[in-house]
From Swiss-Prot:
One of its GO terms (cellular component) is cytoplasm. This is Phosphoribosylformylglycinamidine synthase subunit PurL. ATP binds at residues 52, 91, 493, 530. The lineage of its organism: Bacteria, Pseudomonadati, Pseudomonadota, Alphaproteobacteria, Hyphomicrobiales. Substrate binds at residues 94-97, 116, 240, 312-314, 533. The keyword Cytoplasm applies. Pathway: Purine metabolism; IMP biosynthesis via de novo pathway; 5-amino-1-(5-phospho-D-ribosyl)imidazole from N(2)-formyl-N(1)-(5-phospho-D-ribosyl)glycinamide: step 1/2. GO terms for molecular function: ATP binding; magnesium ion binding; phosphoribosylformylglycinamidine synthase activity. InterPro entries: PRibForGlyAmidine_synth_PurL, PurL_linker, PurM-like_C_dom, PurM-like_C_sf, PurM-like_N, PurM-like_N_sf.
Length: 744
């Protein structure tokens, strides 16, 4: 023990996020009182963020295998085969707590961390996406948080040189004290040149690469495993500071060294920094690790072993190197102006030993440190089943046209252009479809292939019925990829929930996970990577359950992708899928009728698969001219989005007599698409869809400058566009009154 270390007291243990029984487990495991640095290491490795101790037993139920899956969960990122010797590497991860405390730096380092996860595997990043959840617009912090987070996401991605091509932005009062910043990165690699974290070989040099270590981010992972309270602002020093230009240099240096025969294993320093990366590399390779902290490059004087082991300074890597390749490897990193230091060696001892100033500061069993964290099967109770809201029991507050104008200009449904125009979404020159559509499409260089990318979840559904909400999040990602012509291949998940020690919250988690598993199985859409973020609560008030789903699909020919914009006048508008007029948990019911209630729409996975496969086939056959899936806001909002994107109106038939008009136009039934076709193809389309028992009905024709529903007031497309595009920039400029989401 270092003479300057504090004594290990119950209060010190508790301040490290360890429960009394967890500390007793440590005492039994190592047979003595831990040193201060060892306590910090256990705190980092055994917290929720790193160990998944509350979620791991439930994550085992997710489907993770398919013939095209090269690497599933357990590595830095998932890897899927897209043919021709190419692989896609991708993952999504949260940076929620830091982004609430320090929105700009929290968001930048969230982007930087997920980019490192991808290029650590040997992939060059080609795209980023994000899912951002903010509090009610009227909350005094919301505008500041939106501005900081969006600037941070854009600032890092733009400077690093990767396009940010899509995502989600939502507002809800349940995120007032805990915003969510979920970042997804996608990269391309050679399928036979994937790099992994497991070390191999005894007495192999362990090399520190990248930027110097400072005191920023200490206990960042532990902070991410606890609730917030009124003193959360005091945790600002635990937020890391990002440097996208250093990360760009690190990327190029790593990819260059990966072209040599130098690398045995590589791991980025993310949560828990040097501790987690060193322990994982050794434990995965059944090896011990000896580190000498005197060799670690630091940017601050007098850093202790505790600080160096727990720092989460950014833009750093740890690599196990072939010993005869040291000079070659060092020359590469020096060329890029980066630190290169041999800080340790692999050993056969199965021990994690850390020295500083000639003293042994840490001597722990490495496998137990990595894999013996407590595993909890926490009590959980199912969410109460909510009654179905029958459409005929909902009195329409507004005429259909007025309701459309109101909805299209709400925080939930308005254009998020103000956000994505701050991102460089075309850098690299491979972005085929930009933000604002169903899914982004990015060209795969050196060939005709494209990737369809999306991020989706509907938290209000997950709150009302976790199982159906989990299913719907996956199904919508699958639909969005399908709507641009992609073949859905795999997902990454980012599971954001409240305090798992509350049975009702754990019940939400379990229910959503079961729904995700059911949908992934039915749609052949495996989970290959992900992240769990728990304790998203402030003063006991939790967020909406938000299991963000990042989906990746493949287009054999990116030039055959579909988009949502109406293309020409006089085309037939078809509604594919069954419409019952489901209003429970709809945006219409909440924002027009002031009722946030009812069961969400059920998800028929067989119908999702059948309808989606048919739509994708029509896209590939060149039968359809525009495609859009129907989600938030229902049929009429989707039609308005198509009209605004194309600058062309539509003449629409009245709602069928069997369904009340507001339910027909604004219900959020699932497994539905709108497509447009040439009149000459109409009969053949109906014939094909009837043969495979896919519901389809013509609902109108494109043309003119208005959305004109029979028997309703017509709405000019430009007027809709104004409301659609105005709300968010007006809000950020302080030009709109906010008293919460309208009529809530």
């Amino acid at each position: 023990m270092n003479r300057t270390d504090p004594p290990i007291t119950p209060e010190l243990v508790a301040s490290h996020g360890l429960k009394p029984d967890e500390y007793e487990r440590i005492l039994k495991l190592i047979g003595r009182v831990p040193t201060f640095t060892e306590l910090g290491i256990f705190s980092a490795m055994w917290n929720e963020h790193c160990s998944y101790k509350s979620s791991r037993i439930h994550l085992r139920g997710l489907p993770t295998k398919a013939p095209w899956v090269i690497q599933g969960p357990g590595e830095n990122a998932g890897v899927i085969d897209i043919g021709d010797g190419q692989a896609v590497v991708f993952k999504m991860e949260s940076h929620n707590h830091p982004s609430y405390i320090e929105p700009y730096q929290g968001a930048t380092t969230g982007v930087g961390g997920i980019l490192r996860d991808v290029f650590t595997m040997g992939a060059r990043p080609i795209a980023c996406l994000n899912a951002l959840s903010f509090g009610d617009p009227s909350h005094p912090k919301t505008r500041h948080l939106v501005g900081g987070v969006v600037a941070g996401v854009g600032g890092y991605g733009n400077s690093f040189g990767v396009p940010t091509v899509g995502g989600q932005v939502r507002f809800h009062t349940r995120y007032d004290g805990n915003i969510l910043v979920n970042a997804m990165a996608v990269g391309l690699a050679d399928a036979d040149k994937i790099f992994y974290a497991a070390a191999s070989g005894v007495n192999m040099p362990i090399v520190y690469l990248g930027s110097k270590t400072g005191r920023d981010g200490i206990h960042g992972a532990t902070m991410a495993s606890a609730e917030f309270d009124d003193d959360s602002a005091e945790k600002r020093p635990t937020v890391q500071v990002g440097d996208p230009f250093a990360e760009k240099l690190l990327l190029e240096a790593c990819l260059e060294i990966m072209e040599t025969d130098c690398v045995i294993a590589i791991q980025d320093m993310g949560a828990a920094g040097l501790t987690c990366s060193a322990v994982e590399m050794g434990a995965k390779g059944d090896l011990g690790v000896d580190l000498d902290l005197d060799s670690v490059p630091t940017r601050e004087q007098g850093m202790s072993a505790y600080e160096m082991m727990l720092s989460e300074s950014q833009e750093r890597m740890l690599m196990v190197l072939k010993p005869e390749k040291e000079k070659e490897a060092e020359a590469i990193f020096r060329k890029w102006g980066l630190d290169f230091a041999i800080v340790g060696y692999t050993t056969p001892s199965q021990r994690f030993v850390v020295k500083h100033g000639g003293d042994v500061m840490v001597d722990l069993p490495i496998k137990e440190l990595e894999s013996e964290a407590p595993l909890y099967d926490r009590p959980h109770v199912p969410s109460p089943q909510l009654p179905v809201v029958h459409a005929r029991d909902v009195a329409p507050r507004l005429p259909v046209a007025d309701a459309l104008e109101k909805l299209i200009a709400t925080p939930e449904l308005c254009s998020k252009r103000w956000v994505w125009e701050q991102y460089d979404h075309v850098i690299g020159g491979n972005t085929v479809q930009r933000p604002g559509g169903d899914a982004a499409v990015v060209r795969v260089e050196d060939g005709p292939k494209g990737l369809a990318l999306t991020v989706d979840v509907t938290p209000r559904y997950c709150e009302a019925d976790p199982f159906e909400g989990g299913k719907q999040a996956v199904a919508e990602a699958w639909r969005n990829i399908t709507a641009v012509g992609g073949r859905p291949l795999a997902i990454t998940d980012n599971l954001n929930f409240g305090n798992p020690e509350r049975p009702e919250i754990m019940g939400q988690f379990v229910g959503c996970l079961k729904g995700i598993a059911a949908a992934c199985t039915a749609l052949d859409f495996p989970v290959v990577s992900g992240n769990v973020s728990l304790y998203n609560e402030t003063n006991g008030r939790g967020i909406l359950p938000t299991p963000s789903i990042g989906g990746v699909g493949l287009l054999d020919d990116f030039t055959q992708s579909a988009s949502l914009a109406f293309k020409a006048e006089g085309e037939c508008i078809l509604l594919i899928g069954e419409t019952q007029g489901w209003l429970g948990q709809s945006v219409y019911l909440r924002d027009v009728c002031g009722r946030e209630e009812g069961a969400p729409p059920p998800v028929d996975l067989a119908a999702e698969k059948r309808n989606g496969d048919v739509v994708r086939g029509m896209i590939h056959a060149g039968t359809v001219t525009a495609v859009h899936d129907i989600s938030d806001g229902g049929l009429l909002v989707a039609l308005a989005e198509m009209a605004m994107a194309g600058g062309i109106g539509a003449a629409l038939d009245a709602a069928p007599e069997a369904i009340v008009p507001h339910a027909w136009w604004f219900g959020e039934d699932q497994a539905r698409y709108i497509v447009t076709v040439h009149e000459k193809d109409l009969l053949s389309v109906f014939t094909k869809l009837k043969a495979v028992e896919v519901p389809c009905v013509q609902i109108g024709l494109t043309g003119g400058h208005e959305i004109a529903i029979a028997g309703e007031r017509a709405v000019h497309v430009k007027a809709l566009q104004h409301g659609f595009e105005s709300w968010l920039p007006d809000y950020m400029a302080g030009r709109v009154e906010t008293s919460g989401i309208p009529d809530r």
